[in-house]
Curated annotation (Swiss-Prot):
Compositionally biased intervals (Acidic residues): 79-98
One Pfam family named in its UniProt record: D123
PANTHER family in the cross-refs: CELL DIVISION CYCLE PROTEIN 123 HOMOLOG, D123 PROTEIN
Gene (UniProt): CDC123
InterPro entries cross-referenced by the UniProt entry: CDC123 (IPR009772)
UniProt region (Disordered), positions on chain: 79-108
Keywords: ATP-binding, Chaperone, Cytoplasm, Magnesium, Metal-binding, Nucleotide-binding
GO CC annotation: cytoplasm
The protein, known as: Translation initiation factor eIF2 assembly protein
One of the GO biological process terms: eukaryotic translation initiation factor 2 complex assembly
Compartment annotation: Cytoplasm
Biological role: ATP-dependent protein-folding chaperone for the eIF2 complex. Binds to the gamma subunit of the eIF2 complex which allows the subunit to assemble with the alpha and beta subunits.
Family the entry assigns: Belongs to the CDC123 family.
Organism for this UniProt entry: Kluyveromyces lactis (strain ATCC 8585 / CBS 2359 / DSM 70799 / NBRC 1267 / NRRL Y-1140 / WM37)
UniProt-annotated binding residues for ATP: 133, 136, 138, 140, 198-201, 208, 210, 224, 263, 277, 279
Amino acid sequence: MAAESYTPLVDIKVRSDDIRACSFSSWYDKFKKYTPKAKIIQPLPEEFLRYLAQDGIRLSLEENDSTYNDHCLKRDDDNEYSDWEADDDGDNDSDSDDDKNGKEEEMVPMVNFPDLHREIAEVIGEYGAVTPKLNWSAPRDATWILPNNTSKCMNVNDIYLLLNASNYIAYDLDHAFDECEDRDNSDNQSIQFELVLRKWFDINPALEFRVFVRDSEIWGISQRDLNYYNYLEPLQDTFTNLIEEFVYDIVLPNFDLKSFVLDVYLPRPFESCWLIDINPWSRTTDPLLFSWNELASKDLDSDASPEIRLITEHNMGRFVTKEHSENQVPKDVVQASLDPESMRELTYKWKEILKMQEAESDSDSN
């Protein structure tokens, strides 16, 4: 029997210096003219980093926003947030002093990092609304936790909720250097973490693109929002020309790395290119409509334009969903997790529904 042919997995090497070069503050000043306005807060106090890592979200009592009801959300064993466990703990007076002493101190914004809290509030006051990120990642996977279902933050508590609920942010804090061939256990300890607050502006997701640059050449361009938009295909030459001009004339002459991944935005009337982010040339970066094997191994035709890949037909299973929808939950569940009374009411309703289902099941079996 003939052996099945297969494409061997291509080794993609990334070094810790590559990761550091893609940290927002490392490149923002070089491309400030082409990047949405932002404020970088660094260094971040150790208490704030512990706050992001703790099991629960303690919101600020200073924020006059009734949406959050000024209390603590606790993370349960399923990595979901509620205050149910917090209430149970509060009613339990049997904890010994030793148990209490063994618990880590809970970080509270206005107690443990009041200066940072006020600085964030000042930036929001200046910009009106912001969208946050750390060195590399934005909490795109946690937008479900805000009432507007976007990363648009109107107050400090919005930022605390997004950052605490995001797996992307947790990855930045704990695993940013995991794929580096020269990884050192001290890398995460030595990095200076930063909070980036970008001025909010509405982006048409259809006009965001991911650009793969290898050895100072564009090897591929992918639509970033994986839904079908019928007006994109006739414009693909316009998109390619804009991106080529931006990468070769602006980015490559001013950026230290020769292999990296850009996120860009092409606003109408398609006369300019905005730089949104720079990501490492690494398998940890989503290849979207490409695969990392083909990006790392395919030959480049120097006489041809870079390949741009778009969604060219309706994928109904994908089109009716939103990015990161696997992280989202019904609005009544979110509201219940923020309000103790709503949580009790919702839990009561669930129990009643379960009893009815069990009763129906018993009657059917009889």
